[in-house]
UniProtKB/Swiss-Prot annotation:
One of its GO terms (biological process) is ERAD pathway. Residues 1-19 form the signal peptide. Probable component of the endoplasmic reticulum-associated degradation (ERAD) pathway. It comes from the Eukaryota. The lineage of its organism: Eukaryota, Fungi, Dikarya, Ascomycota, Saccharomycotina. Keywords: Signal. The keyword Signal applies. PANTHER family: LONG CHRONOLOGICAL LIFESPAN PROTEIN 2. This is Long chronological lifespan protein 2. Belongs to the LCL2 family.
Length: 120
């Protein structure tokens, strides 16, 4: 009987610890998620745009202040390249090209230019 009581106490204590860790883990994550969601509200984006002191062109994705829209940087410069269209007025950011894999042509700025001209 004494062994049963000790085992019950140990199992009960383990359940309390597991319940505490479970609650702490998910409770903390939920609060973090709520903070993140609150910081990514459309009003925040709008306020950043409206409260900018940029006197030229404010890039919509990066909030960089540049002379003209084509001068905007890519939002992820470490993994994207900026390809300016032949009209020199517009651009697109694409994933940085990788080496030719299994004979598939590399998608780089030359590929974007061909697509712009309707050659693909």
């Amino acid at each position: 009987m004494r062994g049963f009581v000790v085992a019950t106490i140990i199992v009960g204590a383990a359940n309390c610890v597991m319940a505490f860790d479970f609650e702490q883990f998910f409770g903390g994550q939920n609060r973090q998620q709520q903070r993140t969601q609150q910081n990514n509200q459309p009003q925040d984006y709008e306020q950043q745009q409206l409260n900018s002191d940029c006197q030229k062109y404010l890039c919509p994705e990066t909030f960089a202040c540049v002379a003209k829209p084509v001068d905007c940087p890519c939002p992820f410069p470490q993994s994207q390249i900026k390809c300016v269209f032949p009209d020199k007025q517009n651009f697109v950011c694409i994933s940085s090209p990788v080496d030719n894999v299994n004979g598939v042509p590399v998608r780089d700025c030359k590929w974007v230019e061909k697509a712009w001209k309707g050659l693909l």
